């Protein structure tokens, strides 16, 4: 990819509009996890070191006007982020009014100007040209450092980029790193790969799974290990009883198609051998082998020890390891043995590890392994889209807007 980069821009004396993804989990106004905030720091520091003024824009959550007259929600205000930036040594000016922000954008170049949650404006989600023009007045240079929104058509992601000429729009350092790291995986035809996919939302992951099913793209694929809800869908498609775990008809059909494709292309799918099962009316978990019938009143909440060992054994074969999705209901401590076990094995494996996805990243932190993964992506759906699409520069809206 040949997108313009931050280091190719002249920043001194310029107002730099940075579209970031600071969509961090907030509980009562307190940041629960600051991974995405820390990920943007190299870009912010570089701009300030080069003499530029940082105008920082983001969204948080999905504001809704249901039950209220407007989209504003104090719980989702970017004002909640100000104390964090202060603890990092920055002087931050928060401004909710865009007219006032325009005046402040020309002042105090050693301060960060933080705009209010862009999704408090209906126009942000509506691809609104007028809103893009208004935002463009706040900066001389546009920087997209929001990889996690690369697959979205939000105004600040696409139309705003078009308000700046080719020499005044670029990707930030985080975006550049994401592209570099994920390209190692996406376009790799030489290194031995092991892919671990969990979680649910099989429909969202079909293009990515299809990408790895192509033997011409990845002739050295050693295994695709499927756990979590996706693993259950494939077991169901093969006729196994999975208890109360619900798999809808569309998901089942998709799983059957992938199984057929895997057989035709001789792709090595590794499915769960056992699960930890919660029985209705009991707080205890039991381990059930898939060769046995999971009780009708039982729910699979995690992979079992045999599955963990089987997946771990595959990791030793890989030079590159990719994990997206959890192996169970990791939010509950009793149900995270599989997820933490897999992530721990990835951290200890000799291969280069790439892990991503919203829940997967949260699980990495829950298992205290954030410093032991080689690359932790900020992307979820964007990461899946980047890997699974034909040409990211044309197929992902953010990249297409910057490349034109």
What are these regions, as identified by a protein language model?
Residues 1-404:
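Active-site loop-to-helix "anion-binding N-cap" substructures in soluble metabolic enzymes
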């Amino acid at each position: 990819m040949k997108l313009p980069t931050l280091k190719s821009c002249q920043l001194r004396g310029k107002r730099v509009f940075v579209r970031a993804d600071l969509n961090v989990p907030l509980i009562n106004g307190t940041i629960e996890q600051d991974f995405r905030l820390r990920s943007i720091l190299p870009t912010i520091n570089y701009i300030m070191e080069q003499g530029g003024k940082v105008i920082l824009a983001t969204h948080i959550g999905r504001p809704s006007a249901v039950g209220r007259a407007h989209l504003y929600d104090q719980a989702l205000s970017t004002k909640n982020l100000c104390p964090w930036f202060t603890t990092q040594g920055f002087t931050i000016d928060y401004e909710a009014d865009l007219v006032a922000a325009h005046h402040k954008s020309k002042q105090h170049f050693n301060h960060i100007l933080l705009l209010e949650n862009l999704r408090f404006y209906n126009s942000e989600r509506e691809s609104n040209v007028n809103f893009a023009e208004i935002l463009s007045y706040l900066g001389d240079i546009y920087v997209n450092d929001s990889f996690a929104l690369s697959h979205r058509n939000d105004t600040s992601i696409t139309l705003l980029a078009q308000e700046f000429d080719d020499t005044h729009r670029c990707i930030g350092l985080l975006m550049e790193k994401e592209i570099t790291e994920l390209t190692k995986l996406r376009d790799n035809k030489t290194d031995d790969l092991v892919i671990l996919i969990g979680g649910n939302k099989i429909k969202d992951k079909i293009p990515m799974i299809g990408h790895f099913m192509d033997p011409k793209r990845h002739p050295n694929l050693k295994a695709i290990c499927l756990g979590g809800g996706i693993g259950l869908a494939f077991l169901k498609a093969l006729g196994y009883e999975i208890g109360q775990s619900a798999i809808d008809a569309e998901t089942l059909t998709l799983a059957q198609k992938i199984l057929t494709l895997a057989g035709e292309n001789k792709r090595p799918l590794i499915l769960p051998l056992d699960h930890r099962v919660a029985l209705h009316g009991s707080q205890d978990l039991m381990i059930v082998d898939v060769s046995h019938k999971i009780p009708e009143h039982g729910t699979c909440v995690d992979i079992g020890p045999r599955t963990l060992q089987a997946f771990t054994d595959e990791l030793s074969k890989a030079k590159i390891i990719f994990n997206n999705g959890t192996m169970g209901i990791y939010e509950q401590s009793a149900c995270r043995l599989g997820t933490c076990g897999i992530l721990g094995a990835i951290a200890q494996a000799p291969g280069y590890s790439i892990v991503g996805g919203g829940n997967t990243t949260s699980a990495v932190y829950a298992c205290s392994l954030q410093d032991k993964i080689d690359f932790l992506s900020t992307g979820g759906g964007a990461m899946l889209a980047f890997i699974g699409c034909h040409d990211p520069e044309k197929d992902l809206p953010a990249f297409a807007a910057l490349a034109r």
